[in-house]
Amino acid sequence: MSNPFQNIGKNLLYISAAGIASIYVVKTIVKARRDAKFIPKARGNNGEVNEKNYYDNLAQVKPGFPIPKDGGDNIDCSEDHQLVRKSKYEGSGLSAVTRKRGDKLGFLDRRRNE
């Protein structure tokens, strides 16, 4: 009769290595997708508007406005690729950039100046 616990250490090592590797891969993919959503249009597309991927980048989607047809979404329709104000009420940057990191209950996050 063979011992059922003979290879338990080796099996546990394989399972834990596979678990750690899968966690690393999933976290890398999720972080890349999250960062890709908040690329400003001037840096991400260099001013080019593509109809088929308009809703792929959430930073360029404006709720309540139709899909742009002429490629210029700035008020003055300037051709430079700098971040400009969209209107006098809306700033040029993203609010996600200025948000503080961490949660309100994290004591270590409060001490950092980010």
Curated annotation (Swiss-Prot):
<feature type="transmembrane region" description="Helical">
    <location>
        <begin position="13"/>
        <end position="30"/>
    </location>
</feature>
<dbReference type="GO" id="GO:0034551">
    <property type="term" value="P:mitochondrial respiratory chain complex III assembly"/>
</dbReference>
<keyword id="KW-0472">Membrane</keyword>
<keyword id="KW-1000">Mitochondrion outer membrane</keyword>
<protein>
    <recommendedName>
        <fullName>Uncharacterized mitochondrial outer membrane protein YDR381C-A</fullName>
    </recommendedName>
</protein>
<dbReference type="GO" id="GO:0005741">
    <property type="term" value="C:mitochondrial outer membrane"/>
</dbReference>
<keyword id="KW-0812">Transmembrane</keyword>
<dbReference type="GO" id="GO:0005743">
    <property type="term" value="C:mitochondrial inner membrane"/>
</dbReference>
<dbReference type="GO" id="GO:0033617">
    <property type="term" value="P:mitochondrial cytochrome c oxidase assembly"/>
</dbReference>
<keyword id="KW-0496">Mitochondrion</keyword>
<dbReference type="GO" id="GO:0097250">
    <property type="term" value="P:mitochondrial respirasome assembly"/>
</dbReference>
<keyword id="KW-1133">Transmembrane helix</keyword>
<dbReference type="GO" id="GO:0005739">
    <property type="term" value="C:mitochondrion"/>
</dbReference>
